[in-house]
């Protein structure tokens, strides 16, 4: 099944502050689920965003 993360979990995973996490929500960078006053994140969404922003430094010099 799907794994859901708290904001605190996401901050630790991404090494960001709660304010930065709020900014990511405001800028629609991270999708989230709001149930009542609680906000949670799908782990798969976080991993997808990390993959989409992966920058490889594998450059080949001739």
Model region roles, listed by residue range:
Residues 1-19, 23, 52:
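Polyanion-binding surface elements
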Residues 3, 28, 39:
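Flexible coil/turn residues that form the inter-helical turn or adjacent wing/linker of helix-turn-helix
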Residues 1, 33, 58-59:
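Short, hydrophobic secondary-structure boundary micro-motifs
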Residues 27-33:
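Short, solvent-exposed alpha-helical "recognition" segments
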Residues 46-62:
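A short, Lys/Arg-enriched interface patch at domain edges and termini
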Residues 33-39:
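Short Lys/Arg-enriched helix C-cap and helix-to-coil transition segments
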């Amino acid at each position: 099944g799907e794994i859901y993360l708290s904001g605190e979990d996401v901050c630790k995973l991404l090494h960001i502050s709660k304010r930065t996490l709020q900014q990511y929500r405001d800028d629609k960078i991270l999708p989230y689920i709001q149930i009542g006053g609680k906000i949670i994140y799908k782990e798969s969404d976080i991993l997808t965003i990390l993959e989409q922003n992966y920058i490889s430094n594998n450059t080949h010099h001739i």
